[in-house]
Each structure stands twice: as structure tokens, then as C-alpha cells.
């Protein structure tokens, strides 16, 4: 089944002589080969940035910046919440979440998270902290939002690179303006965070064009309270 695979096969052989039995176990490693439309080189694989311009981004949070959060973020100027969010590559919407989240104001606002499967097996990405979705997607969420961030299955919808997903990000009340972003590669073809809990969380910079990747790297910030090993997804600055 697409997206489900194993990297080894274990064979057990039981041999009995009367009531005396012994079991021999052999483990065979399996070469993993991804199916689908996968390039030889993923550099610049994403056709566009998730916002209309990378110049809007003021700072970048790397993957696995927090112990319980695999993705990073792209932050923009305070109060600049009304921004379009677009798909970086052709993909299929698979799961999502809608929940109430208190911002720094203490007032809860609705936040959305969307998860997509690419046409290359094993490569998935998520876009989070969306405030206003396009109708085609928002209509898929039929229950009232709660503080439960549980991810739910959604009817699979296919989108093309550049398709509009949302028209607002972050928290409007306090002006906290950012969009969450993370890529997972089950085949570990790109550099990953090396974090055991999120071993397949990819350092997503290289998926964008070299110019965009360079700009994002120059804006990457590791906060001192974030227990992330520097050099995994190379930061350029560290702030208190």
C-alpha cells in the first residue's frame, strides 16, 4: 500500500526433534525504493514559496525547534496576518485539524493545520497556523472547533502548485503573524533533524530554489530556550 513500507524482513524457522524444538531467526534487510514521481535531485523541487514572496519573511524557525513539534515556521511583520498561502508543489490533501488556540492575548482563535501527500512516495508536508481557509477546504471541517488539536482524515483533494489554500495566518487579535511549515521524508533522502522522535523531519530549505533557500537560511533563528542541536539545520543567529 502507498506510503506503507518496511526496511527488513524477519524469517523464523522452527525445527523440532520430538518435543525438543529450536527456533532460528534470520533478518533480511530490504532496499527501500520510493514509488511515484520522484526526482534524482530534490533541490528546487518546490515550484514556489508558500507565501507570495520570501521577502515577507522576517525570521525562520527550523524543524524540531521544540521537543513536541516537528515543523518550523515562517514569521512575517507583526500584524501582517492577511496574507495568501499557496501550495508549493502538486499534492493531495489527506488530513487536517481545526482547533481553538489562545494567543499571547489569552483569547482563543481558530487555527487550521493541513497535511499533504506529494506524488513522490514518502514525502509529506504540513502547513499550519492558518486563520482563514478557502471555502473548498474549510467546508471539509464539519465539527465545532475545540482545544483538541487532533488530526482528522479529510476527503482527498488534489491541488496544483500555486493553488490558494488560505488568506490569513497566525493570530489576528495580538498580531502574531506566522505560518507553520514542515516536511517529512520517510526515505530520509534529504538532511533531517536527527531528533529521535521526529527522525524524518526534513531540513526543508533545499526543496526551495537556491535563492529562496539562501534567504531562509539567513533568517533562521535558534532561540536559546529551544533544545535544538545547532548545525543540524544550520542557524545563522542565536537570540535570547
Segments predicted by a language model, with ranges:
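Surface-exposed, short loops/turns at beta-strand junctions within beta-sandwich domains
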Residues: 2-7
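Hydrophobic beta-strand segments within extracellular beta-sandwich modules
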Residues: 9-11
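Short, solvent-exposed loop/turn segments at the edges of extracellular beta-sandwich modules
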Residues: 14-21
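Surface-exposed, glycine-biased beta-strand/turn segments
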Residues: 29-121, 158-164, 170, 200-201, ...
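Short alpha-helix capping/helix-loop boundary micro-motifs
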Residues: 77-80, 149-153
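Zn2+-dependent peptidoglycan hydrolase active-site motif and core
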Residues: 88-152, 177-178, 182
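Conserved binding-pocket/active-site segment within a compact domain
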Residues: 161-169, 186-193
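Short, compositionally biased
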Residues: 175-197
Amino acid at each position: 500500500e502507498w506510503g506503507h513500507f518496511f526496511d527488513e524482513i524477519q524469517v523464523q524457522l522452527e525445527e523440532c526433534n520430538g518435543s525438543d524444538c529450536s527456533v532460528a531467526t534470520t533478518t533480511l534487510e530490504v532496499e527501500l525504493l520510493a514509488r511515484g514521481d520522484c526526482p534524482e535531485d530534490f533541490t528546487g523541487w518546490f515550484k514556489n514559496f508558500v507565501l507570495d514572496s520570501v521577502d515577507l519573511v522576517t525570521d525562520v524557525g527550523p524543524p524540531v525547534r521544540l521537543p513536541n513539534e516537528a515543523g518550523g515556521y515562517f514569521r512575517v511583520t507583526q500584524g501582517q496576518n492577511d496574507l495568501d498561502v499557496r501550495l508549493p508543489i502538486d499534492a493531495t490533501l489527506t488530513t487536517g485539524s481545526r482547533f481553538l488556540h489562545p494567543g499571547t492575548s489569552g483569547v482563543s482563535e481558530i487555527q487550521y493545520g493541513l497535511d499533504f501527500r506529494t506524488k513522490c512516495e514518502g514525502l509529506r508536508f504540513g502547513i499550519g497556523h492558518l486563520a482563514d481557509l478557502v471555502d473548498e477546504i474549510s467546508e471539509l471541517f464539519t465539527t465545532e472547533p475545540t482545544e483538541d488539536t487532533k488530526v482528522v482524515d479529510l476527503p482527498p483533494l488534489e491541488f496544483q502548485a500555486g493553488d490558494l489554500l488560505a488568506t490569513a495566518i497566525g493570530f489576528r487579535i495580538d498580531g502574531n503573524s506566522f505560518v507553520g511549515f514542515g516536511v517529512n521524508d520517510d526515505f530520509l533522502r534529504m538532511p533531517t533533524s536527527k531528533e529521535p522522535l521526529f527522525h524524518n523531519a526534513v531540513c526543508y530549505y533545499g526543496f526551495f530554489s537556491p535563492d529562496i533557500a539562501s534567504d531562509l537560511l539567513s533568517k533562521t533563528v535558534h532561540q536559546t530556550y529551544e533544545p535544538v542541536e545547532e548545525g543540524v539545520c544550520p542557524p545563522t543567529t542565536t537570540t535570547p
